């Protein structure tokens, strides 16, 4: 007899309704809730899934390598990266006739193709790849690695090769391994690749499997390293006239501290990047020897956290401190065990860090691009900024979700008595109310300023606008070296201590050249009143998103309205009809509501980045500066003008290469709008509709030839909300992704 899905829950498997299917899917990855699950088995299953996760990533990367080598134009692009458009892949079956086939036969191809806006060409070129053969070799190597990963995942599920629970919970050993091996060695290995392969290739010296053991990356080899003359590796860097990929103007340095960007490629100096990675690698390896493991020396987390409190005999604030300002509690006592025993706490920390890093990458790739010529591929820059910002918001919403699950499932009040976690829970009303106040202040004031400016412009008196200069932000830019504001502070003042120290550094340095360059290549673009207003609009969105998420996590265990909330779990719709006011207050609901605000916020942030850069790239900063001070300017001069090009991807007179984005733009709107159908109508509506459809099905002679085992029932309220927010988010992303790419590509290709 076949086992009914889901095999991990016999209770669900015996459910006679379609609830069996939907709840089975919903809980498939909630390993903690599965039948017969032990803590050790939970860790082992999660450990094994990591191998599968890495394998999926590897297949994705290998697929990119293979398809570009097969269907792209990598070698042609390498020969002229500033003028040849990179091809992502061929389009096998362009629908809608010859017109679309002709429109999509582009970038020198002989058949319909998609243009590549992912930056992969720039990345591979920068790290030293030059031929399709090298791309194929990379794909094959990664596929072999994937096979090993899949084998490793399977192996670690076998009884003899399952790690023990103690192994998973040895935090010191894990931290040493992650710091020294994963981060330390890989950073130094990447420096090795840059020094031995990428930098020689950037200077016209090919390095391949045939000669990488014989080509010296530096004329003096390892002699300066062993003699302590490390400065030799920084001498004779590439000149400002260096033609990337050739020996013209090339130097011999491999580890430099030049600052700024390569004038021709527009990217950070490769020798600066290699220096950056070796420095990080050395620090990480030192850090990887800090924690006590095999030899009984070094720190332990428990000693650090338990010693970090105002009751500890070594606390510097001990004498008289508590008498003056009150007792601070047990601070971090118990925190190590709390984190080490909660996978949700650990995942929350990891997601918060990775989400922040993703947002940092979004900004970094625009302001300080690492890859040769990517700064001049404006559509790719816009696509990558948008991509990484959207990733960031979902990761950070996930961080708070798992923080809330920690409070519901893993938090032990006794183990955390009077420590920082308990203190945060005790002061949650103050935290939440202050955040609420900040949101109202930001929202009302920012909207009022925008609306005032809209009204006075509508009445023909733009001189009556309230325009606030962002003087504090300009001060920060000046401190970093931007001189246009006339603020003589730090690096903007040639006689300040930092400027004199910088001037005293040996060799040439180009940071000041970059920060004071023309706007389209400057990483600190000039800012004014429009920036001030949109900054506060984005701040409103960030604070409101944070308010919803923080409130959801801090109230996850209980609130004045519902003190026993933790007993209902992380996600529940309401506590039945007899207890009013308990709908929409589960911790899951706060994540659900925060996603809408997060999407709003990141749209505003990306609108801002995109419009400002479009204006800079077109040499028309005045348009942004004048139109961004009022809402109609945003609607008319950014959204409407740029949407019009996409909507005309196809029309009664013909079709062009923007048409795929036009279809995506419309389809994204459709998916987005479909979300509201699930968000507004609740479970009863769908149950009645299903029953009507079943009635009609059973009375149709042909349809009734097909039956079903499970009684059809509507999704739960929580599941319907998930369907709604998923449609909203996916539609939002498809709409805006198509908008960004098409509106930029229509101007710059």
Swiss-Prot record:
Residues that hold phylloquinone according to the record: 686
Binding site for divinyl chlorophyll a B1: 669
Organism: Prochlorococcus marinus (strain MIT 9303)
InterPro entries, per database record: PSI_PsaA/B (IPR001280), PSI_PsaA/B_CS (IPR020586), PSI_PsaA/B_sf (IPR036408), PSI_PsaB (IPR006244)
Co-factor binding details: PSI electron transfer chain: 5 divinyl chlorophyll a, 1 divinyl chlorophyll a', 2 phylloquinones and 3 4Fe-4S clusters. PSI core antenna: 90 divinyl chlorophyll a, 22 carotenoids, 3 phospholipids and 1 galactolipid. P700 is a divinyl chlorophyll a/divinyl chlorophyll a' dimer, A0 is one or more divinyl chlorophyll a, A1 is one or both phylloquinones and FX is a shared 4Fe-4S iron-sulfur center.
Keywords, sorted A to Z: 4Fe-4S, Chlorophyll, Chromophore, Electron transport, Iron, Iron-sulfur, Magnesium, Membrane, Metal-binding, Oxidoreductase, Photosynthesis, Photosystem I, Thylakoid, Transmembrane, Transmembrane helix, Transport
GO MF annotation list: 4 iron, 4 sulfur cluster binding; chlorophyll binding; electron transfer activity; magnesium ion binding; oxidoreductase activity
Family annotation (HAMAP family): PSI_PsaB
GO biological process terms, semicolon-separated: photosynthesis
Protein name (database record): Photosystem I P700 chlorophyll a apoprotein A2
E.C. no: 1.97.1.12
Membrane topology: Multi-pass membrane protein
Record localization: Cellular thylakoid membrane
Function: PsaA and PsaB bind P700, the primary electron donor of photosystem I (PSI), as well as the electron acceptors A0, A1 and FX. PSI is a plastocyanin/cytochrome c6-ferredoxin oxidoreductase, converting photonic excitation into a charge separation, which transfers an electron from the donor P700 chlorophyll pair to the spectroscopically characterized acceptors A0, A1, FX, FA and FB in turn. Oxidized P700 is reduced on the lumenal side of the thylakoid membrane by plastocyanin or cytochrome c6.
Residues where divinyl chlorophyll a B3 binds: 677, 685
Residues holding [4Fe-4S] cluster: 574, 583
Keyword Magnesium part of the UniProt annotation: yes
Keyword Ligase tagged: no
Membrane-traversing stretches: 46-69, 135-158, 175-199, 273-291, 343-366, 382-408, 430-452, 532-550, 590-611, 658-680, 722-742
Pfam entry (one): PsaA_PsaB
SUPFAM superfamilies the UniProt entry points to: Photosystem I subunits PsaA/PsaB
């Amino acid at each position: 007899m076949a086992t009914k899905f889901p095999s991990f829950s016999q209770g669900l498997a015996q459910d006679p309704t379609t609830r069996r299917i939907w709840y089975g899917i919903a809980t498939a990855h909630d390993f903690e809730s599965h039948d017969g699950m032990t803590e050790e088995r939970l860790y082992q299953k999660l450990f094994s899934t990591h191998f599968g996760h890495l394998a999926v990533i590897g297949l994705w990367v290998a697929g990119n390598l293979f398809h570009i080598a097969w269907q792209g134009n990598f070698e042609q692009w390498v020969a002229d990266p500033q003028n040849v458009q990179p091809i992502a892949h061929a389009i096998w079956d362009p629908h809608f006739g010859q017109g679309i086939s002709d429109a999509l036969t582009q970038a020198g191809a002989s058949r319909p193709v998609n243009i590549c806006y992912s930056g992969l060409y720039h990345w591979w070129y920068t790290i030293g790849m030059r031929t399709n053969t090298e791309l194929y070799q990379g794909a094959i190597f990664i596929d072999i690695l994937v096979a090993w990963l899949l084998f490793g995942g399977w192996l670690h599920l076998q009884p003899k090769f399952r790690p023990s629970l103690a192994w998973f919970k040895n935090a010191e050993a894990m931290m040493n391994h992650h710091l020294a091996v994963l981060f330390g060695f890989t950073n130094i290995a990447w420096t090795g690749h840059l020094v031995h392969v990428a930098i020689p290739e950037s200077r016209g010296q090919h390095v391949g499997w045939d000669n990488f053991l014989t080509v010296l990356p530096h004329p003096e080899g390892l002699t300066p390293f062993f003699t302590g003359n490390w400065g030799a590796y920084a001498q004779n860097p590439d000149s400002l006239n260096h033609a990337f990929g050739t020996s013209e103007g090339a130097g011999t340095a491999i580890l430099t501290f030049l600052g700024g960007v390569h004038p021709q490629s527009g990217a950070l100096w490769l020798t600066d990047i290699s220096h950056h990675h070796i420095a990080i690698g050395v620090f990480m390896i030192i850090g990887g020897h800090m924690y006590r493991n095999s030899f009984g020396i070094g720190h332990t987390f428990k000693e650090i956290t338990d010693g970090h409190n105002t009751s500890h005999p070594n606390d510097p604030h001990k004498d008289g401190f508590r008498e003056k300002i009150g007792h601070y509690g047990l601070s971090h006592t118990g925190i190590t065990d709390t984190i080490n025993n909660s996978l949700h706490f650990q995942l929350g920390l990891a997601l918060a860090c990775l989400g922040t890093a993703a947002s940092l990458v979004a900004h970094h790739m625009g302001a300080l691009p690492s890859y040769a010529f990517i700064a001049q591929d404006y559509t790719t820059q816009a696509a990558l900024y948008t991509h990484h910002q959207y990733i960031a918001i979902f990761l950070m919403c996930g961080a708070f979700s798992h923080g809330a699950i920690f409070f519901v499932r893993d938090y032990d009040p006794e183990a955390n008595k009077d420590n920082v976690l308990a203190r945060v829970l005790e002061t949650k009303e103050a935290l939440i109310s202050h955040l609420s106040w900040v949101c109202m202040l930001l929202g009302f004031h920012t909207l009022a300023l925008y609306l005032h400016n809209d009204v006075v412009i509508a009445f023909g008196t733009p001189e009556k606008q309230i325009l606030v200069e962002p003087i504090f932000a300009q001060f920060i830019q000046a401190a970093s070296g931007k001189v246009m504001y006339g603020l003589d502070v730090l690096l903007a003042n040639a006689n300040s201590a930092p400027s004199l120290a910088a001037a005293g550094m040996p060799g040439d340095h180009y940071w000041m050249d970059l920060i004071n360059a023309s706007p389209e290549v400057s990483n600190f673009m000039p800012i004014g009143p429009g920036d001030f207003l949109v900054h506060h609009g984005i701040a409103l969105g960030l604070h409101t998103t944070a308010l919803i998420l923080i409130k959801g996590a801090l109230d996850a265990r209980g609130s004045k309205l519902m003190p026993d909330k933790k007993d209902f779990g992380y996600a529940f719709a309401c506590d039945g009809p007899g207890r009013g006011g308990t709908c929409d207050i589960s911790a899951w609901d706060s994540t659900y509501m925060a996603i809408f605000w997060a999407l709003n916020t990141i749209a505003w942030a990306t609108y801002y980045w995109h419009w400002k850069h479009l204006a800079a790239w077109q040499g028309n900063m005045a348009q942004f500066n004048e139109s961004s001070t009022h809402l109609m300017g945003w609607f008319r001069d950014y959204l409407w003008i740029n949407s019009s090009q996409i909507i005309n991807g196809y029309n009664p007179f013909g079709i062009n290469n923007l048409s795929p984005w036009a279809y995506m733009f419309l389809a994204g709107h459709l998916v987005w709008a479909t979300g509201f159908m699930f968000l507004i109508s609740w479970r009863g509506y769908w149950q009645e509709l299903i029953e009507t459809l079943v009635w009609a099905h059973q009375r149709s002679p042909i349809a009734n030839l097909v039956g079903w085992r499970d009684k059809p029932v509507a999704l739960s309220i929580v599941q319907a909300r998930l369907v709604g927010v998923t449609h909203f988010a996916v539609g939002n992303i498809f709409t805006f992704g198509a908008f960004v790419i098409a509106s930029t590509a229509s101007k710059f290709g």
